UniProtKB/Swiss-Prot annotation:
Source lineage: Bacteria, Pseudomonadati, Pseudomonadota, Alphaproteobacteria, Rickettsiales
Enzyme class: transferase
Name of the featured protein: Putative methyltransferase RP459
Superkingdom as given in the UniProt entry: Bacteria
GO molecular function: S-adenosylmethionine-dependent methyltransferase activity
Protein source organism: Rickettsia prowazekii (strain Madrid E)
EC number(s) on file: 2.1.1.-
Keywords, comma-separated and alphabetical: Methyltransferase, Transferase
Alphabetical GO biological process terms: methylation
Family matches, as Pfam families: Methyltransf_11 (PF08241)
Family of the protein in this entry: Belongs to the methyltransferase superfamily.
Length: 226
């Protein structure tokens, strides 16, 4: 088990600090460092050890942490293999890395809807939705990064919205709007907006939430989860 009295914990991309609060309740005497790339989010909650830093530019000493947690962020990482390798080096030999992210065939209906409506509006298609890591690729990515034990699971979550525009607004409101948007040379036209908005039926889609636990050494997970 992780020693609750002296654990060194890193939470990457803490956002509004909800998970930070849960960690502080469980590991009351632990050294918990949290990071985020948004100063507004870091200022939104109280914690002694906060770092303003991009998720892909983390710099810590080797063997620094007993536990590293990364919730709903891996789908934003450009060089996933390099990121996972760095996480592995930050962990102590008996440490644990826990994370989840949006992956698989998430938002495939929205992706298709955008392509169809761009064609109907006379636009050349540009990517509106970032590519996702598939469930089957996760174990190999972690193993190649130096982890020896990996447990991966997933959950499909159904979405129902009035139309694609409402779904896109909700995605934007939770801070998950596409990083590729800045590369577009145009905004959604009035014609395309109308096509997306005037769906006859409820617009349905899904997201796949992929979760994993990984450890550098074999048997670490079994011993810690007993």
């Amino acid at each position: 088990m992780i020693d609750k009295s002296s654990a060194d914990i890193l939470e990457i991309s803490a956002k509004c600090g909800y998970l930070t609060g849960l960690l502080k309740n469980v590991y009351r005497s632990a050294n918990i460092i949290v990071t985020d790339m948004s100063p507004l989010l870091l200022d939104s909650f109280d914690h002694n050890h906060k770092l303003l830093i991009d998720d892909e530019n983390l710099e810590f000493q080797k063997d620094s942490f007993d536990l590293i947690i990364y919730s709903l962020g891996l789908h934003w990482i450009n060089d996933v293999q390099r990121f996972l390798y760095n996480i592995r080096t930050f962990l102590k030999s008996d440490g644990i890395f826990i994370g989840n992210f949006v992956g698989g065939d998430s938002l495939k209906n929205l992706r298709k809807s955008l392509i169809d409506n761009e064609i109907a509006s006379g636009f050349k298609h540009s990517p509106h939705i970032s590519p996702f890591i598939h469930f089957d690729h996760v174990p190999m990515l972690l193993l190649h990064a130096g982890f020896s034990e990996v447990i991966v699971d997933y959950e499909n979550i159904a979405l129902k919205f009035e139309n694609p525009i409402v779904l896109m607004k909700e995605i934007k409101n939770i801070g998950e709007s596409n990083a590729l948007n800045s590369q577009h040379n145009y905004a959604i036209s009035k014609k395309m907006f109308s096509l997306l908005k005037n769906y006859i039926n409820v617009f349905e889609d899904n997201i796949t939430l992929i979760s994993f636990i990984a450890a550098p050494n074999k048997n670490s997970l079994r011993l810690k989860l007993l």
